[in-house]
Amino acid sequence: MNIDDKLEGLFLKCGGIDEMQSSRAMVVMGGVSGQSAVSGELQESVLQDRSLPHQEILAADEVLQESEMRQQDMISHDELMVHEETVKNDEEQTDTHERLPQGLQYALNVPISVKQEITFTDVSEQLMRDKKQVREPVDLQKKKKRKQRSPAKILTINEDGSLGLKTPKSHVCEHCNAAFRTNYHLQRHVFIHTGEKPFQCSQCDMRFIQKYLLQRHEKIHTGEKPFRCDECGMRFIQKYHMERHKRTHSGEKPYQCEYCLQYFSRTDRVLKHKRMCHENHDKKLNRCAIKGGLLTSEEDSGFSTSPKDNSLPKKKRQKPEKKSSGMDKESVLDKSDTKKDRNDYLPLYSSSTKVKDEYMVAEYAVEMPHSSVGGSHLEDASGEIHPPKLVLKKINSKRSLKQPLEQSQTISPLSTYEDSKVSKYAFELVDKQALLDSEGSADIDQVDNLQEGPSKPVHSSTNYDDAMQFLKKKRYLQAASNNSREYALNVGTIASQPSVTQAAVASVIDENTTASILDSQALNVEIKSNHDKNVIPDEVLQTLLDHYSHKANGQHEISFSVADTEVTSSISINSSDVPEVTQSENVGSSSQASSSDKANMLQEYSKFLQQALDRTSQNDAYLNSPSLNFVTDNQTLPNPPAFSSIDKQVYAAMPINSFRSGMNSPLRTTPDKSHFGLIVGDSQHPFPFSGDETNHASATSTADFLDQVTSQKKAEAQPVHQAYQMSSFEQPFRAPYHGSRAGIATQFSTANGQVNLRGPGTSAEFSEFPLVNVNDNRAGMTSSPDATTGQTFG
């Protein structure tokens, strides 16, 4: 070893550039290991300048010699080197001894000054060698003790002759056969299998495997965030989080997908991208190829799936597929993908993608199989493929409605294109209005939106129909008592226009009945909220329904079945739909309408039910006259509003005089009691007429009113109205009556038992007769809908 070092120093110091390169080549071949080549390069870089001082050359030479000895000691005392290395070293040493004379010839040609330098160098080197040899035994013993452990890195020679560093992992986990460098790493890994977490947090009792994880977790409790972003000032517990956050400011994307070369700013996004885009795609291709191989083998053997196999559960059907395809680990990873497969032997349709709110997007992407897989069948049936359009349909989550898919006996590329799948995905597209109506919007004033809507899907649930019937019944029975809905007729803020009269509708719409229109001219109402007394009992409504459904006179053309009638209790005011009428039909409407409340609608609803009860009574004289028809009155309403959303029915007008709410329901609880035109109820609050009402043009005496009422009672075949003493309308109240109602021509007419009341109610002193003066022109229940053939009252 000493001879080699001396020769190396000699050739480097005395020779020229060419000699230095040749000596460097000799050192590479004759060195003990390839590390000597590295040392030769270092010597060349250090000693390339010929004018270096003598002491610097000696110091550099000493450093190189120490590094060589250290490397040689490590290699000699480690018995993990390959045997070829030692054989190669012996051969290289013999080659260096053969080439020594050539090297000495070059060294003899140097000048005298250089020779003196060489001899001086040899003496100094010898002194340094002697000192190191004295210390060598102690250093070797220490190094031997240290190297008895497993070395961190081992120098090895690769197959191509290059050097490599190998890290031995001698500590192997007995659970999963994972190897580790040290026992510490192994014990830390074993905690994962055993579940042991020795480090516990003192504040939240969380446990951790490593201590640094506990220390990092404790910063959450203390609120310490030592790492701060320079640009935005955000602070972080971990330095990694801060560095990741800084990439949002700089826009740096250091991570790249190895498949599509797309860059990402975070590693988790790269992994997610690979998992979603590339790994699943590769797995699908592998699965498709395996299924294609299965199909060819089954076609060659003439195998066809039996219906018994189709009736098996999905997991049991997948087991023989896994065994036959030989997918051991990939089948476990593909569980999420195989759940979407429906025994499809060919990938004709890609799996349907699930979107939010359980909407299914049906993707019909027909993939062409291989040429060896049923090519003749595909050519024959390719002209018949008509994939349905992409539609959005809210699917039903019930598994009981999913019909089992029946496979065809002869397996072909189009065996999975079945009628059941087509019916599952292909539905009619509904328009926006029908969608809004079908979603249960109670505030849309439509009459027959369910009857006019699109047909129901094939796999619709029957619970939806039950729910809709229940909603109809609840809306019919509780329309008057539901406090959550707002029935405020905000008419007081609307000024009366000269050609358009604002109207509010609070009515129950039926196929054969009319609605009641509130005249805004007469809505000078003072409302007192008394919700406890304004609720119509359910018994009363049920009695009415029973009465309408089971009439004794055999006239069943009027159906009040809850299941067949849709009740809309919303209020719509649309002044743009109100047509203009002539000036002769206008009545002076100078007073502004005041605001009303829910009680207003309740009372109108009660009055409408009472009038409907009068019309459908079995002894009522109105049912015996076939000439009655829907009645319109063009003299009382300046411009009758046309509500386009309520089936274009003709409405009877009902002027409302001033009254106060708070009355109980004026309906009778049983249908066999008497019904009368003036709604008389047992109310605790009278409805006095205010004396400051607008004076009108003409008035009708009370005597005319009494004559017409008595003539009506005589005209009836079987009178069902109770006889009330109407003499109270005589002289004591005639004068204030004429003074207060002089503006409107109050008209009373009788025709076939109907009374058109356009007169006022009682005065303030009659508390025993709380007359609600809202009787409209009753619509006749006849079969002819033509209004011109009927009788017009007024």
UniProtKB/Swiss-Prot annotation:
**Positions bearing the Glycyl lysine isopeptide (Lys-Gly) (interchain with G-Cter in SUMO2) cross-link:** K6, K88, K115, K132, K291, K308, K356, K402, K421, K424
| Sites bearing N6-acetyllysine, chain numbering | K607
For this chain, the Swiss-Prot or TrEMBL PTM comment says: Sumoylated with SUMO2. Desumoylated by SENP3, resulting in the stimulation of transcription of its target genes.
A GO BP entry: protein-containing complex assembly
The UniProt annotation puts the region (Disordered) at: 298-346, 574-596
Q: Which residues get modified to Phosphoserine?
A: S51, S250, S301, S306, S412, S665, S784
**Which stretches of the protein fold into C2H2-type zinc fingers, per the record?**
171-193, 199-221, 227-249, 255-278
Coarse class of the primary localization is nucleus
**Localization (cell):** Nucleus
Q: In which tissues is it expressed?
A: Expressed in heart, lung, kidney, skeletal muscle, liver, brain and spleen.
**Pfam families in the cross-refs:** zf-C2H2
Q: Which residues carry this modification: Phosphothreonine?
A: T194
Q: Which domain of life is it from?
A: Eukaryota
Keywords on record: Acetylation, DNA-binding, Isopeptide bond, Metal-binding, Nucleus, Phosphoprotein, Repeat, Repressor, Transcription, Transcription regulation, Ubl conjugation, Zinc, Zinc-finger
Q: How does it assemble?
A: Interacts with HNRNPDL. Interacts with the 5FMC complex; the interaction requires association with CHTOP. Interacts with CAVIN1.
Task: Give the function comment from the record.
Answer: Involved in transcriptional regulation. Represses the transcription of a number of genes including gastrin, stromelysin and enolase. Binds to the G-rich box in the enhancer region of these genes.
* Similarity section: Belongs to the krueppel C2H2-type zinc-finger protein family.
The entry's protein name is Zinc finger protein 148
- Which species expresses this protein natively? Rattus norvegicus
